[in-house]
């Protein structure tokens, strides 16, 4: 069932996928992968508060789950709770210093808080680990343009 739900998400059939995740969680209420994927699906539908609840639920079961922490940070960022998002990314980075997604996402949140020079450092750091990380490159280019325009 998890594979079917994932495939539906790939096809952007999020509402249908939710039903599969709900069925999975009825059977295996502590399936962390299903909980996180359910949260991501809710997030894709713009149901951020519910997504946040799912990530918190996953973290209650497995407190150091990097996927749940990064996704929680992403939702908090979307909700403009940048400091809280950064806290999530900091936990990830305390567990995995080379996590390029957490580094780049932290840069995005730092940038939204107005510290563009610091954001640039995070994007460069992510690119030093993975020089093909598109999000970091696009974010770096955008941040540099912002710096030039001010």
Please tell me what each predicted stretch does.
Residues 9, 36, 43, 70, ...:
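Position-specific recognition of the canonical hydrophobic site in helix A of tetratricopeptide repeat
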Residues 32-33, 66-67, 100-101, 134-135:
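Helix-start (N-cap) detector for alpha-helical repeat units in TPR-like alpha-solenoids
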Residues 1-33, 37-44:
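Alpha-helical segment of the N-proximal tetratricopeptide repeat
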